[in-house]
Swiss-Prot record:
SUPFAM superfamilies: FMT C-terminal domain-like, Formyltransferase, NAD(P)-binding Rossmann-fold domains
Protein name, UniProt field: Bifunctional polymyxin resistance protein ArnA
GO biological processes: lipid A biosynthetic process; lipopolysaccharide biosynthetic process; response to antibiotic
MF annotations from Gene Ontology: carboxy-lyase activity; UDP-4-amino-4-deoxy-L-arabinose formyltransferase activity; UDP-glucuronate dehydrogenase activity
Function: Bifunctional enzyme that catalyzes the oxidative decarboxylation of UDP-glucuronic acid (UDP-GlcUA) to UDP-4-keto-arabinose (UDP-Ara4O) and the addition of a formyl group to UDP-4-amino-4-deoxy-L-arabinose (UDP-L-Ara4N) to form UDP-L-4-formamido-arabinose (UDP-L-Ara4FN). The modified arabinose is attached to lipid A and is required for resistance to polymyxin and cationic antimicrobial peptides.
Binding, (6R)-10-formyltetrahydrofolate: 114, 136-140
Species annotation: Photorhabdus laumondii subsp. laumondii (strain DSM 15139 / CIP 105565 / TT01) (Photorhabdus luminescens subsp. laumondii)
Keyword DNA damage: no
């Protein structure tokens, strides 16, 4: 039976060995690039695959059409996923004739999602296990094929429990893989009423809340001790990591976090006390508790807890959905640079925001707004400002996937708007210059211009009207129920990290990225309808500065406002954009790495975008509102933006060439 395997970590190695033992014909293994911090503790799927002479790949996006086609060509009978960290698309899951199976580290339907072992210890569970289940589009929700239970001891840590889970997985595979190979296996539907979901944990989640009971705090210590970053607290500004502790059933009359004794080191909790067995200062060694107290100059009755400065300054909390996108990642950079914001972000990937992951003011979860509704509602309730930036915003998708555009851009975002109403939170909503449609004004004005779109059979307008309808709904909630909002309308923002060349290869990108791909691959630059359409191109840094000032909202000037953010002086046709880009390409220091220019090629919009497309001849913003409300004007010339964008993509392309 031919198998494709998606695997990572120790469990991935266990799964591959079990499949080999059971006689499966492994056609290919997909994994992730090894993290040396993890491989110090856990085995490498890539190395095991190499030792077994199995084809192994580590694509950045396995759901890309190119990889889907390669998997289709292998004609797998079955697909297995063992601790692979990316969600597999329906297109991949449908390729296996026998089905797709995933091993999950809990007794489903409990503890769906990420880090189930850590969460089980944290929540004080006494039992967990492993589950092999059928894979469906919703994560961890398919029919259960087999389970194996594991007891959690009071002394178990995430590492020791992982060892038990590994042994349980081996036993489960020995039992069930022959059944799958024979095509005779049970499939029990999950009880959705019993389902629980937990998201990804990050290092900042290890901060100790001393108001909790000693048992709860000790569970946190056990859940995140080595090889994880550890549970931590602060003595003033100095960080203390607690690696091992013991809860004591002692009563006291002190404030939580008070040091009751230094030898042994005992700290008061909301209920009971906690003896610190081993710990470490930020710059010190792993030591016993009483030695830690000496190193930190602790005395009886001193208090540990949150970092001193965080108790003084309350930073504004900003929720960004779609944080890995073009606007999201640049906005995150600007907010972190300011220093007065904590950012909570969600996206289905993290390629553009890896540079922020270690920042303590950036909190990221990998997830899908279609699925992680509980997480979203909780963080809307928790945060001060909400920016729902998730949308399909590439023209070819408007005609290729109009219903998906409507479902994501309107229906899913409407849920977020209603949560903001429910919890009285400020929403900054990304409208679009597309809402103006075929407006015949010389400049598009937020307050007076007509919003004109084409006939129903021109499906490209589904994006425009989805956004426009949400604009109207948000405005109505503001008028009738007091929703605090600002609508901003970007006009052709561009710069580094706008889409990527892989998305351009399947036509799902904005204009400049598509043009750069043509230059990189030596294919003709296609000018849709001759490229005579005019746009006003705005540098991402100009755009983000305006958006940052909307978030600041000094004196509340942006409340209830619609604000165009564009650069009217950077007006050019698509053909002119292509010509400037070509000149910059020919002058670039990396030019010799790429094929000769293949010329311009005029194509009709119908053949390029498909049936149902209709274009707009010009789109120039009035920016009076931005000037008046934000004290903002764009300053960056289009040629500078083109040069920086081209340089970013060319260096990335050369780096890829070096890998291949």
């Amino acid at each position: 039976m031919k198998a494709i395997v998606f695997a990572y970590h120790d469990i991935g190695c266990v799964g591959i060995n079990a499949l080999t033992k059971a006689g499966f014909d492994i056609q290919a293994v997909f994994t992730h690039t090894d993290d040396p911090n993890e491989n110090h503790f856990f085995s490498s799927v890539a190395r095991l695959s190499a030792d077994l002479a199995l084809p192994v790949f580590a694509p950045e996006n396995v759901n890309h059409p190119l990889w889907i086609e390669r998997i289709r060509e292998l004609k797998p009978d079955v697909i297995f996923s063992f601790y692979y960290r990316d969600m597999l698309s329906e297109d991949i899951l449908s390729l296996a004739s026998t089905g797709a199976f995933n091993l999950h580290g809990s007794l489903l339907p409990k503890y769906r999602g990420r880090a189930p072992i850590n969460w089980a210890i944290l929540n004080g569970e006494v039992e967990t296990g492993v589950t092999l289940h059928k894979m469906v589009l919703k994560p961890d929700a398919g029919d259960i094929i087999a389970q194996y239970k594991v007891a959690i001891a009071e002394t178990d840590t995430a590492l020791t429990l992982h060892g038990k889970i590994r042994e349980a997985a081996e036993k489960l595979f020995d039992q069930v893989l022959p059944q799958i190979k024979a095509g005779i296996y049970p499939a029990i539907p999950q009880d959705e009423s019993q389902a629980t979901y937990f998201g990804r944990r990050t290092a900042v989640d290890g901060e100790i809340d001393w108001h909790k009971s000693a048992t709860e705090i000790n569970n946190l210590v056990r859940a995140v001790t080595e090889p994880y970053p550890g549970a931590f607290t602060f003595l003033g500004e100095r960080k203390i990591t607690i690696w091992r502790a013991c809860p004591l059933n002692e009563t006291h009359d002190k404030q939580p976090g008070t040091v009751l004794s230094v030898d042994p080191l005992i700290i008061a909790c909301g209920k009971g006390t906690l003896e610190i067995i081993n710990g470490q200062s930020e710059s010190g060694l792993y030591v016993q508790g009483h030695r830690l107290a000496v190193d930190m100059s602790m005395v009886t009755d001193v208090r540990v807890g949150p970092k001193a400065t965080t108790q003084i300054n309350h930073r504004k909390r900003v929720l960004i959905l779609g944080v890995n996108g073009f606007i999201g990642n640049h906005l995150t950079e600007r907010l972190l640079r300011d220093g007065n914001y904590d950012i909570y972000g969600m996206d289905i990937g993290s390629s553009a925001i890896e540079r922020f992951i270690s920042n303590p003011r950036f909190h990221f979860i990998e997830g899908d707004i279609n699925i992680h509704t509980e997480w979203i509602e909780y963080h809307i309730k928790k945060c001060d400002v909400v920016l729902p930036l998730v949308a399909i915003a590439t023209p070819i998708e408007y005609t290729r996937n109009p219903l998906r555009v409507f479902e994501l851009d309107f229906e899913e975002n409407l849920k977020i708007v209603r949560y903001c109403v429910k919890y009285n939170k400020r929403i900054i909503f990304p409208s679009t210059s597309e809402v103006y449609g075929m407006c015949d004004d010389k400049e598009f004005d937020e307050d007076d211009s007509r919003l004109i779109v084409g006939p129903i059979n021109k499906q490209r307008w589904i994006y425009s009207v989805s956004k426009q309808l949400l604009d109207r709904v948000i405005w109505a909630y503001g008028e009738k129920e007091g929703l605090k909002f600002t609508l901003f309308r970007p006009f052709n923002w561009m710069g580094p990290r706008l889409d990527n060349l892989n998305s351009a290869r399947i036509g799902s990108s904005r204009a400049i990225t598509q043009l750069i791909l043509n230059l990189v691959e030596g294919s003709p630059i296609k000018l849709v309808d001759g490229g005579e359409q005019k746009r006003c191109f705005t540098d991402i840094n100009d755009g983000i500065e305006a958006l940052f000032r909307i978030i600041e909202n000094r004196e509340g000037l942006c409340d209830g406002q619609i604000i165009n953010i564009g650069n009217p002086t950077n007006e050019a046709s698509i053909r002119q954009l292509a010509e400037i880009l070509l000149d910059s390409f020919e002058d670039h220091e990396l030019r010799d790495h790429f094929p000769p220019f293949a010329g311009f090629k005029k194509v009709e919009s119908g053949s390029y975008y498909g049936k149902g497309y209709q274009d707009v001849e010009h789109r120039k913003p009035s920016i009076k509102n931005a000037e008046r409300l934000l004290d903002w004007k764009p300053t960056i010339d289009m040629k500078q933006t083109i040069n920086e964008t081209l340089d970013f993509f060319l260096r990335g392309a050369v780096e890829e060439l070096g890998k291949n």
